[in-house]
């Protein structure tokens, strides 16, 4: 059997084995894992002599582990496994044989031994640590820990046990945690003294003999210290041994591996300080350990001081010491801010804070961002504490200047690009992203300082920015771009203090002192020569700042032409990233300065002309499966989407009130005519399904719609102050609508073209107004095709709601003409089968938009169009769809809307209220529909009971209650319109037909006649819940 198992493992792991045979071998080994007797064979395979191959032994022990952890080995058998493995360990590790197992096998054995510890230490293997410690000596008569291989294995198990029961980062169930806690208690009670004594012996006897042993031992001390008696580690003997290892930091040159030992020694102190204690005890511990001196010595050691700013600088040690500083300062601050801490302790903590401030600054200002990031948490805690103090006593803010000033200066210095950075390089993107993330974290700290001492923050930043611009004036393009970028970045952040409600001004005056300072900075920046901003990073910062503080230009209009000229240079920038970002920012700027840019409209349109040429790009022609093709396509899309901002900017500039309508038409046609020619040129090829031509048409239509969006902010039915453009301009955009419709009618099978056309339609409403109404049938015919998705239909319905709301006085006849064919397409979309979750979501959305459309028609006094002679044939379909939706147990939102539509129909067509205290006190907006009263009673009223009669309906569900409230509102509306006729129907037919008893009927009818609309909406859900009507 053993040979069979060994052969199977060998075959399964052999890459050149026959695939069929390999599959059989895999299956056999996997069956072995679940075989209750499989582990016995594997244990024998692992321990036998001579040793099997490494892979056989590894897999064999893995099977034993799997069986033990899977519960296939009972306690008695686990003792057998323990005896077998212990005998093996004594044979291989206990005699300094010199040929111990490779690390992967050692780790696997340690894993098994750790599991056996968890299962048997409480009962069955009480001598666990004694047995393992026996491996650390060459013979029972040895007086020292002199067996290197045994010591390494012992420490490996010690560290594994911590991972199993002591590591707080490991997620455990409640039972697992209870077991871990019980095992820790047992160790403390039985063996902790001898374990810590063994660490001292090992560190003492091997301090210069074996770096691997010393490092593993230090890691064990550092990990176990969090859950053992601190006195077992913090005692003079152990501290002397730790200080000896720290001494390695003072060496100029370390042999390979010594760095790990030195860093592990520092980590022990970090773990000691990280141990949970009362604030008083922690502060005394920091003082007792003399951590200030330890950190000073480490900071002044050759790797961190002598080698700083050289290639030999030891960043690993710097980060390790920074962790120690960070955890220490966090605890110092905690003692200062915690309630109930004695005054004496706080005085000690304050002294320690002053002592550690230089250490904070040393590592916070480290040139390596990883080191700086390590101490950000303690800086954040310190500033949070100082901010709390300043809020309680603002006078203390100035007293803390000695702490805040150096931190603020360090923050600003760390926000500067370092000398090795290369902005914009492809291979530097990760570094750039990490640096920007660091800037964000530093920016938060800077905001905290500003909230503690605003005056200090303003003075430091103002002085830095002013000095930078003075240096720029003197040295011009010779200035280091990093310094200018830093000043501009600080200007951008400064707005958090200066800008209120999007502006630097309130009623024409600067918001505050910060706004005054920022206005001074803006003057310096804008009056600087843009040619001095030689680096793309500073050029982008310039544009971002101009946009963010555009309110500055409202009060310094004489500077606008120069700034626009600078922007027109940057929108032509050779670097794509700068150019495309500038397109967006240019649009933002002119939108905010619209009233001041009319006099340069012609100049701008001419300057942008070459950038308004549209070139659609298909994904690169590359071999199938090349991953770059999708990236190329995304890049091309991103560039075109950015180009659209230029079209919007042109629309904004050309539509300023200071430009006469004829000039507006002239400028806009200069942009439109090339696009019209391009569409005409590509249309025939697009009809032949040429992909690039279709994409070109899509881009052209999107550009036309975006130009319209820039030209007019006006939307029908909104309260925006904008108005429709002049008639001449609207006439010009009527050509845009016509060109779009011609393309749409020819290419309506293209999803992309329909998408672009729908976008253009929504934007053309704002420039055409009611001129667009006669074209509605053509838009509907093009946008709602046989291939249109439900999502497209829902989006177009939403647009139609807006049109109806905006043009309700002019749309009746057109709506009357198009309603039937339009709704038939919607019904077709609703009826199509769904094939997945996305389809179901789109269907639900289409239903809701359909109901919203009906509500828009009814709410805008256009309900007559639904019952007109032309649309009479679809009236029954409209009603039946609403009835169906009102009974949808799986979509309460739609059901609720369906009842809202039925209520609106009832109030619109049911005639005047015949009951005092009418449904809502408003007269019907439309003439009553003959016979509709009886129709409401017989068709609408039963629907109110249909949904709650469904077996799976839960009347206590929050959404269900809302549906029932809406259904109750419908019943009250029917009663308001029909009075006693409805009550009689309920008494004699509807309620008895449901099996409701006479007493309940009278209570229900009485409530309906007595309560108002609001009252009955509340009553109906309660009625169903209390009377259990569903089961009657």
Curated annotation (Swiss-Prot):
Record-linked SUPFAM superfamilies: ARM repeat (SSF48371)
UniProt KW keywords: Cytoplasm, Nucleus, RNA-binding, Transport, tRNA processing, tRNA-binding
Broad class of the protein's primary localization: nucleus
InterPro entries cross-referenced by the UniProt entry: ARM-like (IPR011989), ARM-type_fold (IPR016024), Exportin-1/Importin-b-like (IPR013598), Exportin-T_C (IPR045546), XPOT (IPR040017)
GO annotation (BP), single: tRNA re-export from nucleus
Record localization: Nucleus; Cytoplasm
Entry's Gene Ontology cellular component terms: cytoplasm; nuclear matrix; nuclear pore
GO MF term set: small GTPase binding; tRNA binding
Role according to the record: tRNA nucleus export receptor which facilitates tRNA translocation across the nuclear pore complex. Involved in pre-tRNA splicing, probably by affecting the interaction of pre-tRNA with splicing endonuclease.
Family: Belongs to the exportin family.
Name of the featured protein: Exportin-T
Organism annotation: Aspergillus fumigatus (strain ATCC MYA-4609 / CBS 101355 / FGSC A1100 / Af293) (Neosartorya fumigata)
